[in-house]
């Protein structure tokens, strides 16, 4: 039996992927405000009601005709933002038609910089990923596997140098409260030395 994703993930420092066709889109808008969005795209599925998790659950495993249209709508929405965190994107497998959805949305939204974090590698069956899309060139991108069962990750994106730099952590946390607290403690340690911090993503919990 073939085993996927058995390689141990470690913290990694990466450069962003560059979308050469949209380098003219770099920089902040005229009002100098950074527009942020976090979006769990559910592999491009359309989930409107709780029952759809059952009736449309097969769409998380297999390709379907509506996915391309859903991604186009998402891409149109993303074009209004400067920095986007994506959760539940597929990095290119049978269910997504072998399309890297992070890269695809970077093209649709005209983002010059993007990065895909692969958290669960199931080969051709699924490439469970987080992603970041940015109009500003990151100074550094850190890829962090989170504590707890394998398959959860955080991306730390840094703009600038030293303690005055802006750090943005994009994450998809666990369902269980105990593991989620461990993951948040890990993130807290990551950002402690920075003055300007933004946390965004799918926390799988409600704000208190």
Model-inferred region functions:
Residues 177-208:
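Metal-dependent phosphoesterases centered on the DNase I-like endonuclease/exonuclease/phosphatase
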Residues 123-125, 147-151, 176-180:
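Solvent-exposed loop/turn segments connecting transmembrane beta-strands
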Residues 111-124, 144-146:
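A short, structured active-site edge motif that brings together acidic residues
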Residues 39-41, 89, 171-173, 202-203:
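Active-site metal-binding loops of divalent metal-dependent hydrolases
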Residues 85-87, 115-118, 198-202:
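Active-site neighborhood of phospho(di)ester-bond hydrolases with catalytic His/Asp-centered motifs
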